[in-house]
Amino acid sequence: MIRCLRLKVEGALEQIFTMAGLNIRDLLRDILRRWRDENYLGMVEGAGMFIEEIHPEGFSLYVHLDVRAVCLLEAIVQHLTNAIICSLAVEFDHATGGERVHLIDLHFEVLDNLLE
């Protein structure tokens, strides 16, 4: 079953990463690619993403997941969210020499499949 997730990223967060010499969009693509290849619990049959511009507020990351068991969707979304937050925090820490960034507001909304 295909589900669509939306992650809204504020423009201020994107600017903070840019000032640290990082491209948050590229980081999110890489994180999602690694997460998809890891295939948490073998429950994800496919995953794709695209970015929608929302000027000047930032952008939205849409992730389309083909999951085997909808009952595990909440656990899969939580695992993906944790992977994104932890990976972004580590990348920011390395790029800034130990600075921290507030990422707790990053969370996915589960939407109906936008492709159907």
From Swiss-Prot:
Domain of life: Viruses
Any one GO molecular function term: identical protein binding
One Pfam short name: Adeno_E4_ORF3
InterPro entries: Mastadenovirus_E4/Orf3, Mastadenovirus_E4/Orf3_sf
Entry keyword annotation includes Repressor: no
Key words of the record: Early protein
Gene3D superfamilies assigned to the protein according to its UniProt record, in alphabetical order: Mastadenovirus E4 ORF3
Protein name, UniProt field: Probable early E4 11 kDa protein
